[in-house]
């Protein structure tokens, strides 16, 4: 064993050669199936598909004019199939993906080298619309090849076959419901689920076709998302601006009200109500500064002369409509340069528009309450969904000879043994997790830090957070910290009240200059405030000071639990070690120096086209592994590949060497946030980048790399078959449940692991897919290692849903978002959404996320 310093007892094995050029990068085959742990009977929300061994015929569809929404394209193709039934389609039931791809079970009478051009008329509101559709043969898609791949006779699952089956299974639901990604939604009949702010919850289902061992599977899950409520724009505005009714708004909107309203309605579709049956639709591009009574536009008169006319006057003259709310602004619709204005009162929000903007905190918690289902309830809902979807009577599914089993798939899983957790102090107590949780009572940190110089800065109002509150809080914190083995010696050297984000930097500078050896500043916040972002910006990036924020409510009323959680974070930020995995129980990979890397890229919220994406990579710095260092970069908007990975990994390897005096012989890389479609691209770029980082350090330095993608955003759920196995109020699967058969990839190395105890709703197991493995892990070794790493997250005494390095990478990227916040922009929404980084050049952004030298080697993100 190596302990972070001292000799390596086990000689390193010979390291594998560099991989061949990029085109040969291929995920490794599954080495074996795991056997560790006790078996557990489960059901998974995937349904076996019976696929015939036929050929499917693939045609390319080209619709002119282009760029119609998928819904319109589907209508065009449906009309085309009906209209040209006699000449071309006969009794065939083609399926269409809404873009370019059409599939049939029998070939169409179209020569392979010819293109057929048809004219299709869609009846429209007001006038008919005419489209030109060109059809040409593309390929035969062999379902036999799919069978061969699933049974292992062919190396790769043919992507085009899976895609064709997906289109077949989605064709009818796409016509019945509102498709969003791989899910389908419909407005809840009879029972609205309002979220506030003009938004509501729509329920639906996720559906996707997935290859697994021997069989194709249909993955079905319940799904929910936020849509905009179909309602008059006036009512929408009242919800957004928190007016009880429009009657209380007799004055024009203030600037801040108008800005807030514009932010919400911009980009939405509205339909007009003042032209009888012709409910023409427009997209909102802006909200006018001036009210309808004053907003003018150039009106061309019959004489050919152009005059400036107000919107209110125009509606009175042209539509005989006297506006009820001429003091309110207008919507500017269509193209901005065309000056088309509509009064709010003649517009409705069009139904079926999904909300892609970020939900507020209140909306998010309402959404969670509305959608959380215990595991047995979710299982029942999915079974109901399957019955109502009735795939086996779907005429399009039957056309292709596909059958789907009605029952969920039975799977045998295994519950892995949790690791033992070692504490410090005199007792060197050992904790054994039960259902993913353990207790720190009567235990002391493995390495506790003694705090001698510390300060309190209270940004909560003195009348709410009194000096008595602060005194009690200080006493209680000192007591709990002493019990935990992190003694806080004496009273704070400084304890003062302050107000607003602007006072953070001057106060912190004063503290740093006045109190030598200051270790920690505890900052008390009055709820959600821009002060938090500024504290972290100044502490992490400007002055290099350790800060711990505490909400005012936790100071007014202290509990041992919250104080204990605070101590977990403080000890780690100051360089302590809370606990470690019991060395005797760790997997064999620890016998040589090994570095664990976690990587994640976070993107700005949908609908934001300017803010950069943030890439974070963390690396373990000891043998436990407990301490981590972070690197972070800003990169191109929505860029998933980590652009500067080579330099980031190089930094971490140098830091590892400085901390341990060892060069890692193995690199275990947990990569979060990559979807299946990006596997090849990410593997190619990032594996080479890691290799490059090693070679740049030393020409012959070639540690073995294992590259694992961690996925949380999937729809596979596991349920206990035996009621007695269910855990907790939500009836979930036990922590440690692992599955690597039947519902996993037919040939590649992947597995599901639910490492945490589900508290609310249905547990989501994490999916791990090994894209590269020089270290030749067995299934048991990698599954046990991954599960143990889920127990090393420092913020709590429970196992978490993904390995600690991947979790830390997420925290680092999230913290960098705060570092980018401009302190002068306050925001009611909460600090991390306020006036960020727009228009700042790349260099300034890179500098903004650069952590201070004194903070660099600490776990400031904990």
UniProtKB/Swiss-Prot annotation:
Swiss-Prot/TrEMBL GO biological process terms: miRNA-mediated gene silencing by inhibition of translation; miRNA-mediated gene silencing by mRNA destabilization; negative regulation of translational initiation; positive regulation of nuclear-transcribed mRNA catabolic process, deadenylation-dependent decay; positive regulation of nuclear-transcribed mRNA poly(A) tail shortening; pre-miRNA processing; regulation of DNA-templated transcription; regulatory ncRNA-mediated gene silencing
Residues the record lists as binding a divalent metal cation: 600, 672, 810
Annotated segments matching region Interaction with guide RNA: 314-319, 527-569, 712-713, 756-764, 793-815
PANTHER family named in the record: EUKARYOTIC TRANSLATION INITIATION FACTOR 2C (PTHR22891)
Keywords in alphabetical order: Cytoplasm, Endonuclease, Hydrolase, Magnesium, Manganese, Metal-binding, Nuclease, Ribonucleoprotein, RNA-binding, RNA-mediated gene silencing, Translation regulation
Gene Ontology MF terms: endoribonuclease activity, cleaving siRNA-paired mRNA; metal ion binding; miRNA binding; mRNA cap binding; RNA 7-methylguanosine cap binding; RNA endonuclease activity; single-stranded RNA binding; siRNA binding
Family of the protein in this entry: Belongs to the argonaute family. Ago subfamily.
One family name in Pfam for this protein: ArgoN
UniProt-annotated location(s): Cytoplasm, P-body
Gene: ago2
Feature: compositional bias, Polar residues: 830-841
Keyword Cytoplasm: yes
Keyword Thylakoid listed: no
Protein species of origin: Xenopus laevis (African clawed frog)
Principal EC category: hydrolase
Needed cofactors: Mg(2+); Mn(2+)
Segments of this protein annotated with the region Interaction with GW182 family members: 590-593, 653-663
Domain notes: The Piwi domain may perform RNA cleavage by a mechanism similar to that of RNase H. However, while RNase H utilizes a triad of Asp-Asp-Glu (DDE) for metal ion coordination, this protein appears to utilize a triad of Asp-Asp-His (DDH).
GO cellular component: cytoplasm; cytoplasmic ribonucleoprotein granule; nucleus; P-body; RISC complex; RISC-loading complex
Protein name listed in UniProt: Protein argonaute-2
Top-level taxon: Eukaryota
InterPro entries: AGO2, ArgoL1, ArgoL2, Argonaute_Mid_dom, Argonaute_N, PAZ_dom, PAZ_dom_sf, Piwi
Protein role: Required for RNA-mediated gene silencing (RNAi) by the RNA-induced silencing complex (RISC). The 'minimal RISC' appears to include ago2 bound to a short guide RNA such as a microRNA (miRNA) or short interfering RNA (siRNA). These guide RNAs direct RISC to complementary mRNAs that are targets for RISC-mediated gene silencing. The precise mechanism of gene silencing depends on the degree of complementarity between the miRNA or siRNA and its target. Binding of RISC to a perfectly complementary mRNA generally results in silencing due to endonucleolytic cleavage of the mRNA specifically by ago2.
Domain PAZ, first and last residues per copy: 232-351
The Piwi domain, residue ranges: 520-821
